[in-house]
């Protein structure tokens, strides 16, 4: 499970507060994961463990999924601050 040390930190990268940056963040993360899987070719067990963890995080809709924003979860308080959104 040596290859998991390069995949698990990806789940800890936070989404940006600005909703306008969510799409570019998800595209970047998707391309990063695709290029990592094609270049490093992790073992099947590591890939399944990572995809299972990613599925559970996105399915639970806690707001940590980088692929999309759940409609049921609310935006953070800082997202309504014009000083943060304007940056």
UniProtKB/Swiss-Prot annotation:
It comes from the Eukaryota. PANTHER family: BLADDER CANCER 10 KD PROTEIN HOMOLOG, BLADDER CANCER-ASSOCIATED PROTEIN. Keywords: Cytoplasm, Membrane, Nucleus, Transmembrane, Transmembrane helix, Tumor suppressor. It is a multi-pass membrane protein. Acts as a tumor suppressor; induces growth arrest at G(1)/S checkpoint and apoptosis via RB1-dependent and p53/TP53- and NF-kappa-B-independent mechanisms. Modulates expression of genes involved in the regulation of proliferation, cell cycle and apoptosis. SMART domains: BC10 (SM01396). The chain crosses the membrane at residues 19-39, 43-63. Belongs to the BLCAP family. Its main location: cytoplasm. It is found in: Cytoplasm; Nucleus; Membrane. One of its GO terms (cellular component) is membrane. InterPro entries: BCALP. The lineage of its organism: Eukaryota, Metazoa, Chordata, Craniata, Vertebrata. It comes from Xenopus laevis. This is Apoptosis inducing factor BLCAP B.
């Amino acid at each position: 499970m040596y290859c998991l040390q390069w995949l698990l930190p990806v789940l800890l990268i936070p989404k940006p507060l600005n909703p306008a940056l969510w799409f570019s963040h998800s595209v970047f993360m998707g391309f990063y994961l695709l290029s990592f899987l094609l270049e490093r070719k992790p073992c099947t067990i590591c890939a399944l463990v990572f995809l299972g963890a990613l599925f559970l995080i996105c399915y639970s809709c806690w707001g940590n999924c980088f692929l999309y924003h759940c409609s049921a979860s609310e935006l953070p308080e800082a997202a309504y601050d014009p000083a943060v959104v304007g940056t």
